[in-house]
Curated annotation (Swiss-Prot):
Protein name: Lipid-A-disaccharide synthase
NCBIfam families: lpxB
Source organism per UniProt: Pectobacterium carotovorum subsp. carotovorum (strain PC1)
Gene Ontology cellular component annotations, sorted alphabetically: membrane
InterPro entries per UniProt: Glyco_trans_19
Enzyme class: transferase
Catalyzed chemical reaction(s): 2-N,3-O-bis[(3R)-3-hydroxytetradecanoyl]-alpha-D-glucosaminyl 1-phosphate + UDP-2-N,3-O-bis[(3R)-3-hydroxytetradecanoyl]-alpha-D-glucosamine = lipid A disaccharide (E. coli) + UDP + H(+); a lipid X + a UDP-2-N,3-O-bis[(3R)-3-hydroxyacyl]-alpha-D-glucosamine = a lipid A disaccharide + UDP + H(+)
Function: Condensation of UDP-2,3-diacylglucosamine and 2,3-diacylglucosamine-1-phosphate to form lipid A disaccharide, a precursor of lipid A, a phosphorylated glycolipid that anchors the lipopolysaccharide to the outer membrane of the cell.
Pathway: Glycolipid biosynthesis; lipid IV(A) biosynthesis; lipid IV(A) from (3R)-3-hydroxytetradecanoyl-[acyl-carrier-protein] and UDP-N-acetyl-alpha-D-glucosamine: step 5/6
Lineage: Bacteria, Pseudomonadati, Pseudomonadota, Gammaproteobacteria, Enterobacterales
Keyword terms, alphabetized: Glycosyltransferase, Lipid A biosynthesis, Lipid biosynthesis, Lipid metabolism, Transferase
Amino acid sequence: MSSRPLTIGLVAGETSGDILGAGLIRSLKEKVPDARFVGVAGPRMQAEGCEAWYEMEELAVMGIVEVLGRLPRLLKIRRDLTQRFSELQPDVFVGIDAPDFNITLEGNLKQRGINTIHYVSPSVWAWRQKRVFKIGKATNLVLAFLPFEKAFYDRFNVPCRFIGHTMADAMPLHPDKQAARATLGIAPEAHCLALLPGSRNAEVEMLSADFLKTAVLLREHFPDLEIVVPLVNSKRREQFEQIKSSVAPDLRVHLLDGQAREAMIASDAALLASGTAALECMLAKCPMVVGYRMKPFTFWLAQRLVKTQWVSLPNLLAGRELVTELLQTDCTPDKLAAALLPLFADSDKTAALRTTFVDLHQQIRCNADEQAAQAVLELVKPR
């Protein structure tokens, strides 16, 4: 029997992965207090005791130009990690998200006899589905947030475990709408709309004008309408303000630094870009409309690559259209406003929608950190 402590290799490539990694380490330490954690870690993972061979910022690059500029460094780091983990022989290696970096690394380590886990499934079920074969070769197990992801991997006999979603664990089943309104300074009885035009430069550029024009149309129906716009950082805020000054200079809005979750909980309805925001909005029990537009060629390409009937996670989870999706040429102020209007009514339909949101929340609320830790320990080879 080896006297070496349980050793887990970890690589996180961005802030979301750092949060997941920290939760995983916490849960593992509860079960194995003397375990050692080592690899590429952000500040949260390091605060939980993970030894960082490299800082996470080294991997956190976005955009083709930036990636190309950093490629020699990224390849060097991956070669070095392959060598160091091969020498260390951790009991299990966990690559957290960052699939372009981690899946190749996982494959290298699996070939060297190390059990590997990929934590957070890439969207292989939606596009570039053939990646599933590479993932199957590179990993012993995929940890998936959503049940339809596991169903996809099962079709290809790739080991996958559905662990639930950490966001579903973090959010209450029945959020306090009035408390959120008090936090944001929204009147208790006012109609309230959240606008979330995305977190990326291109999204804010493509969507903000039509989202603002939609809000102007809704204000005509609801003179007391409060409009809250959470923006992820100062760059997006500045970009949004510039667009607003030319499109709707007289429209009164509450610009928020972050606070997307509070904005969703406080609102009667939300208009948002697709992505994780739609899942968060569902967990906030806020009825929504998804509006999205891309450059024409990008949309043409996406239509040929994307294999799913819907783009928003609430619809994918439900297996039916719960949430109206207005994409590309359908993403117009008139159509967006027409889809949003009924959501402000306290009707049986909106009540049923919120009940369905609660049911879906319960489906993916499984204590993901604990489930992930259990999956890691089950892959540890007997010594």
